[in-house]
């Protein structure tokens, strides 16, 4: 297993990335391809006493900044850590690629270098939602597709369902459509047109409409919405954590589960190989969990599972 990590992406990279890799390699025998400025990375790994036959540094002299145009930057910076990461992934030299760098560049690279799985209308990104009773759900889409068609939301439900089952280990995930009321026929035109598709979808267990007040209870494991709505929900949840932390509740058993560092990042669901995006302010723990999520997606053959399911639709 070869896991690719962009060591230059993130506000605190490459130092925190190095610490995350150090923590992972202390208890793993999977090879980590660390993509970044070779001299700097060697110096940092040496300073932290990291020496492992499973550590492989790939030199990338350039990096894509947060404010650079994704498509333009990937084209003009072929030697950037993100561009080289996608090249290695496309060539099969690594089995997954993850970064806390430029989100747009990661999305463009996934869409045009790795490409969507056959039959997937639009890949999606999801965010994990902590539940009050201790479970974890997933919200899809959270920003990749601001405007959606009903058929796309129907597929997001399938992709989220597969993720809940094979990555979150939820045996029989329940799918809900985020809406302004529980009754069938509620909502805007998109929600009204999506409901019957989800209701007739034999690949999921659809419970119906789900109101915003039920996001954090156990009514649904997979919550489906367009990316515009999902991104607002995600940012509101993040703001709720910040407010709780400001009030001294950051270590509360429930609110602490909102912290991004506890999760491995956001996978792009529906592309041919595992691609993971992590928060730009990632610390060592976040990088470590990003590597662990990469490992799980590879071991579970998650992308192959999606491919198989979409062949049978």
Regions found by a protein language model. Name each.
Residues 88-107, 182, 186, 191-255:
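Glycine-rich phosphate-binding loop
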Residues 111-135, 139, 215-313:
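Glycine-rich phosphate/nucleotide-binding loop
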Residues 50-94:
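Phosphate/nucleotide-donor binding subsite
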Residues 15, 33, 39, 146-208, ...:
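Glycine-rich phosphate/diphosphate-binding loop of Rossmann-like nucleotide-binding domains
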Residues 25-29, 46-54, 168, 198-204:
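Short helix-capping segments at alpha-helix termini
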Residues 1-42:
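N-terminal phosphate-binding or glycine-rich loops at protein starts, especially the Walker A/P-loop
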Residues 13-18, 79-89, 96-110, 121-125, ...:
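Short glycine/serine/threonine-rich phosphate/pyrophosphate-binding segments
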């Amino acid at each position: 297993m070869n896991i690719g990590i962009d060591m230059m992406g993130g506000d605190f990279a490459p130092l925190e990335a190095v610490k995350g890799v150090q923590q992972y390699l202390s208890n793993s025998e999977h090879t980590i391809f660390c993509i970044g400025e070779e001299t700097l990375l060697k110096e940092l790994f040496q300073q932290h006493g990291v020496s492992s036959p499973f550590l492989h540094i790939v030199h990338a002299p350039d990096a894509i900044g947060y404010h650079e145009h994704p498509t333009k930057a990937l084209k003009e910076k072929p030697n950037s850590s993100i561009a080289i990461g996608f090249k290695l992934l496309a060539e099969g030299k690594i089995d997954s690629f993850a970064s806390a760098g430029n989100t747009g560049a990661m999305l463009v690279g996934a869409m045009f270098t790795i490409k969507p799985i056959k039959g997937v209308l639009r890949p999606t990104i999801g965010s994990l939602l902590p539940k009050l009773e201790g479970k974890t759900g997933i919200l899809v889409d959270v920003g990749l597709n601001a405007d959606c068609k009903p058929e796309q939301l129907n597929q997001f439900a399938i992709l989220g369902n597969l993720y809940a089952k094979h990555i979150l280990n939820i045996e029989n995930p329940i799918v809900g459509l985020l809406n302004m009321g529980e009754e069938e026929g509620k909502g805007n035109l998109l929600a009204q047109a999506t409901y019957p598709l989800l209701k007739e979808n034999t690949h999921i267990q659809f419970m119906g409409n789900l109101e915003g007040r039920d996001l954090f209870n156990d009514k649904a494991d997979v919550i489906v919405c367009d990316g515009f709505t999902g991104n607002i929900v995600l940012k509101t949840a993040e703001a709720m954590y910040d407010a709780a932390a400001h009030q001294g509740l950051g270590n509360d058993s429930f609110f602490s589960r909102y912290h991004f560092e506890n999760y491995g990042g956001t996978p792009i669901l529906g592309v041919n190989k595992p691609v993971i995006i992590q928060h730009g302010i990632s610390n060592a723990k976040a990088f470590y969990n990003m590597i662990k999520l990469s490992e799980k997606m590879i071991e579970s053959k998650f992308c192959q599972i999606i491919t198989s399911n979409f062949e049978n639709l």
